[in-house]
């Protein structure tokens, strides 16, 4: 699956989730799209934070699932850097 195909699948699935979606609801699309640089951290039951890390493990973007403009920074990162879909540990 290419980066753009993985992102399209991930974005379509997430766009259908309610704002209060659980970490399990968010994790499924990440795993099925083969996306490895986006992680779920700070799972608080109904609120989760998505974290994007670069190849060295440094955080480059983060947002809570309830933030109204959370996707804006994420889209900038995706357009600039793409999405890692390898499965190698960092």
Curated annotation (Swiss-Prot):
InterPro entries: DUF905, YkfF-like_sf. Pfam families: DUF905. Gene3D superfamilies: ykff protein like domains. It comes from the Bacteria. Belongs to the UPF0401 family. This is Putative UPF0401 protein YpjI. It comes from Escherichia coli (strain K12). The gene is ypjI.
């Amino acid at each position: 699956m290419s980066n753009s195909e993985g992102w399209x699948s991930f974005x379509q699935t997430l766009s259908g989730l309610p704002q209060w979606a659980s970490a399990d609801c968010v994790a499924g699309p990440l795993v099925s799209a083969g996306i490895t640089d986006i992680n779920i951290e700070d799972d608080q039951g109904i609120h989760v934070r998505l974290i994007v890390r670069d190849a060295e493990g440094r955080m480059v973007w983060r947002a809570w699932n309830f933030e109204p403009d959370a996707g804006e920074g994420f889209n900038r990162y995706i357009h600039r850097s793409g999405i890692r879909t390898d499965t190698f540990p960092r």
